[in-house]
Amino acid sequence: KETAAMKFQRQHMDSGSSLSSSSDYCNKMMKVRNMTQESCKPVNTFVHESLQDVQAVCFQENVTCKNGQQNCHQSRSNMHITDCRQTSGSKYPNCLYQTSNMNRHIIIACEGNPYVPVHFDASVEDST
């Protein structure tokens, strides 16, 4: 069975590529990572950093999650991410996405022992 930590890696980790070079990236990745099977997942973020670096965020600044839970953490540094958003005209099973590359701080929820990422909460721009 897929654990929450495994699901996080499937849905949000893409360490292999530093940035999604093609506009087709989200269309391909959302399909390959099984996020268009029963419906189109409307929004998803991929992180192009090493799993080690993303797991380390669990021990960085503690912030409140969007849902009010207290187990979210914000990355100290910017990370290369790709935001995938479903385009307005696309309908299941033909899920189409808009690909946006960004460099932002990520906010993830962590839990368990070992304490690992289980949910991608948000990304934020530098507050400077």
UniProtKB/Swiss-Prot annotation:
GO terms for cellular component: extracellular region. The keyword tRNA processing does not apply. Its main location: secreted. One of its GO terms (biological process) is defense response to Gram-positive bacterium. Disulfide bonds join 26-84, 40-95, 58-110, 65-72. Pancreas. Substrate binds at residues 7, 10, 41-45, 66, 85. Residues 1-20 are annotated as: Disordered. The keyword Signal does not apply. PANTHER family: RIBONUCLEASE (PTHR11437), RIBONUCLEASE PANCREATIC (PTHR11437:SF24). Monomer. Interacts with and forms tight 1:1 complexes with RNH1. Dimerization of two such complexes may occur. Interaction with RNH1 inhibits this protein. Belongs to the pancreatic ribonuclease family. Endonuclease that catalyzes the cleavage of RNA on the 3' side of pyrimidine nucleotides. Acts on single-stranded and double-stranded RNA. This is Ribonuclease pancreatic. The lineage of its organism: Eukaryota, Metazoa, Chordata, Craniata, Vertebrata. The gene is RNASE1.
